[in-house]
Amino acid sequence: METNYSVIFMTIINFCILVAILKHFFWDKIKGIINERQDFVDEQLLKVDEDSEKARMYLLENQRILQTAKEEGKKITESQKEKANKVYDEIVEDANEEAKSLLERAKTDIQREKEKAEYEIKKQAVDLAIELSIKALEENIDESKHRELISNFITKVGM
């Protein structure tokens, strides 16, 4: 196969003419489109960087707010816990005072009932002694009868 230099030369000249025509009519438009696209991509990258920075700032702010809310929640919880403990202590103290009061009233009631019972026993003893004296005065009592009356008296008194 033989190389035809004239065909190669003409092809190169045709190519150069084609490039010159394309450059003259289309190169500026293509370059403008490429530059617009590059500018758009650069703007988008800047916007992404700005949005990323804003998102990071919002994240930090939200973390700070969340931490503050946690601390406030903890303070509120502690405050309510302290109030509950105070109420509990007051309730226990009131219950203890009420129990002491009931105990004192019970002791007073017991003492009163004891005194009442002692009074009744003394009254019965006096009544029995009077009754015994009346019987002794009504009858002539011999010693065995006297012992029997005393024994009955002791039995009734409960000694």
Swiss-Prot record:
The organism's superkingdom is given as: Bacteria
Q: Where in the cell is it found?
A: Cell membrane
What Gene Ontology cellular-component terms does the record carry?
plasma membrane; proton-transporting ATP synthase complex
Q: Which InterPro entries match?
A: ATP_synth_B-like_membr_sf, ATP_synth_b/b'su_bac/chlpt, ATP_synth_F0_bsu_bac, ATP_synthase_B_chain
The cross-references to CDD domains, in alphabetical order and at most eight, read: ATP-synt_Fo_b
Gene3D superfamilies reported in the protein's UniProt record? F1F0 ATP synthase subunit B, membrane domain
Q: What UniProt keywords are attached to this protein's entry?
A: ATP synthesis, Cell membrane, CF(0), Hydrogen ion transport, Ion transport, Membrane, Transmembrane, Transmembrane helix, Transport
What is the topology of this protein in the membrane according to its UniProt annotation? Single-pass membrane protein
Transmembrane parts of this sequence: 7-27
Q: Which GO terms describe its molecular function?
A: proton-transporting ATP synthase activity, rotational mechanism; proton-transporting ATPase activity, rotational mechanism
The free-text function statement in the UniProt record for this protein reads: F(1)F(0) ATP synthase produces ATP from ADP in the presence of a proton or sodium gradient. F-type ATPases consist of two structural domains, F(1) containing the extramembraneous catalytic core and F(0) containing the membrane proton channel, linked together by a central stalk and a peripheral stalk. During catalysis, ATP synthesis in the catalytic domain of F(1) is coupled via a rotary mechanism of the central stalk subunits to proton translocation.
Which HAMAP family did the record assign? ATP_synth_b_bprime (MF_01398)
Q: Family, per the entry?
A: Belongs to the ATPase B chain family.
Q: How does it assemble?
A: F-type ATPases have 2 components, F(1) - the catalytic core - and F(0) - the membrane proton channel. F(1) has five subunits: alpha(3), beta(3), gamma(1), delta(1), epsilon(1). F(0) has three main subunits: a(1), b(2) and c(10-14). The alpha and beta chains form an alternating ring which encloses part of the gamma chain. F(1) is attached to F(0) by a central stalk formed by the gamma and epsilon chains, while a peripheral stalk is formed by the delta and b chains.
State the protein's name: ATP synthase subunit b
Q: Name its species.
A: Clostridium botulinum (strain Eklund 17B / Type B)
Q: What is the lineage of its organism?
A: Bacteria, Bacillati, Bacillota, Clostridia, Eubacteriales
